[in-house]
Amino acid sequence: MEGLINGSVYYKIFDKTFNNSSHRYIKKNNSINETEIVENKKSITTYFKAQDILILNQVHGNQIVNADESIIAVPEADGSITTKKNLILAVQSADCVPVLLASGDGKIIGAAHAGWKGSINNIISNIVTKITEKGAKNLIAVIGPAIAQSSYEVDDEYYKAFLSKDINNKQFFIHSIKENHYMFDLPAFVELKLKEAGVKDIKNIAEDTYTNPLKYPSKRRSYHLQEPYNQNILSAIVMK
């Protein structure tokens, strides 16, 4: 457990080295049973000595859930914010960029799943706006482990989509050895979006999920190796 704001806000990246979980947190198919999910969530709440945990049904979008409001079903969203103590906010990832946020006074927290679709469609500015509207100031952010530029090859259509949003996005791409393909720096893009939104205090873990198979699940690595993709990193934050 890392102290983001000692005495009030803590976070942890639950990777493969955390042995008290099978690293499955949402039931998306019949290969995952409900008991397994319940036990995995319980292991996280026990670790933090917290009361509850909110894990979203992520859809690679830009919607943010206010977890202060009553939530009955698992929300379809890619970010959450709260002022509640002992409520863990968590996002799953396996190459996409997890972002954890806290106000400088330790009274508001947030978590976002920033894949390329969510990132290009302003999920970072959305969550910063939402958390600021609740009174957060002097935001602190953690960028969790994600796929690095050296591991992330994309095609020309993807490249053009980013440049159509802003020609300056060209800085995040370098040519691949494969014709009409590029290597994209998604974590750097997310970091810039945090800075543009006014976040100055940013901790970037800067570890490549693709090249660390013993520590991190990677959807792209699993695809390339023709292996099942059935685990996720869980990036979690809580106020005490």
Swiss-Prot record:
SUPFAM superfamilies: CNF1/YfiH-like putative cysteine hydrolases. It holds the Pfam family Cu-oxidase_4. GO terms for molecular function: adenosine deaminase activity; copper ion binding; oxidoreductase activity; S-methyl-5-thioadenosine phosphorylase activity. The keyword Aminoacyl-tRNA synthetase does not apply. Zn(2+) binds at residues 60, 96, 113. Keywords: Copper, Hydrolase, Metal-binding, Oxidoreductase, Transferase, Zinc. Its EC number is 2.4.2.1, 3.5.4.4, 2.4.2.28. It comes from the Bacteria. InterPro entries: Cu_polyphenol_OxRdtase (IPR003730), Cu_polyphenol_OxRdtase_sf (IPR038371), Cytotoxic_necrot_fac-like_cat (IPR011324). Its cofactor is Cu(2+); Zn(2+). It catalyses: adenosine + phosphate = alpha-D-ribose 1-phosphate + adenine; S-methyl-5'-thioadenosine + phosphate = 5-(methylsulfanyl)-alpha-D-ribose 1-phosphate + adenine; inosine + phosphate = alpha-D-ribose 1-phosphate + hypoxanthine; adenosine + H2O + H(+) = inosine + NH4(+). The keyword Chaperone does not apply. Homodimer. Belongs to the purine nucleoside phosphorylase YfiH/LACC1 family. Purine nucleoside enzyme that catalyzes the phosphorolysis of adenosine and inosine nucleosides, yielding D-ribose 1-phosphate and the respective free bases, adenine and hypoxanthine. Also catalyzes the phosphorolysis of S-methyl-5'-thioadenosine into adenine and S-methyl-5-thio-alpha-D-ribose 1-phosphate. Also has adenosine deaminase activity. This is Purine nucleoside phosphorylase RC0672.
